[in-house]
């Protein structure tokens, strides 16, 4: 727990009064005690943004808040049709709620309730190898779930490593953000830890040390592994950091070696290439990669930022 000091507003009033002529005044109620976070860093100031940016931020938050099922916390893959929920969308929604708090668009209590509902759903939903009636297996979840029941949406829906990672990044973000002593915030942290610990990452290493894109109960493991620079960076990071089912460090080493065909040059500047913008954005939503280098990027004289 951080060191905290209590500063009485009454003491400040007395100090000011001592510098002024004494006057007879009627007794006043004692001001409330002010709690000061002594060693907490100052809150960063939100930069001034063009009105368009502010509008995009607000609308993005509102999409997740307004379209998510309040009963189970599931967020649709698309709108307005909302045929099914995406577990990746849920990860982004869990991240959006604190942004709403920080901007004053929802209260902390509202966001806590929504987040706790979501995490309880993923903790309690049926899991197993069966083709129907389940939301996931081995700690991983199906890419698309029925919006109401939260079960696998259809037979073409895979148990997805990267979408589970996107969900889990939101879960772990919630665990970090809700750091108060409120019993509900403590429960958020506990459930988040439980969900992360359940994921059996080595199970998807059918061609170790690389990690497969997923699994179907009908046909088994997907034949393709995560290779080349892309959004799967967070898959390997989560798998390496697992407190219960970690993959070995050579998973990262071998994965980065698959970058070799992904380099390009623009105006004399060498860069790590991946066409779709989301491949560069997704992992960076939650991890600040500035000045971080692994052995591979150090050899190239580059970074991920």
Give short role names for the model-derived ranges:
Residues 43, 47-51, 80-84, 101-106, ...:
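Second-shell loop/turn segments in exported
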Residues 94-102, 169-176, 239, 284-289:
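Short glycine/serine- and small hydrophobic-enriched flexible loop segments
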Residues 84-91, 95-156:
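Membrane helical hairpin/interfacial module
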Residues 21, 29-85, 127-140, 240:
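Low-complexity, Ser/Thr/Pro/Gly-enriched N-terminal "stalk/linker" regions
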Residues 1-10:
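Bacterial N-terminal signal peptides that target proteins for export
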Residues 50-51, 131, 135-164, 177-305:
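Extended ligand-binding clefts on enzyme/binding-domain cores
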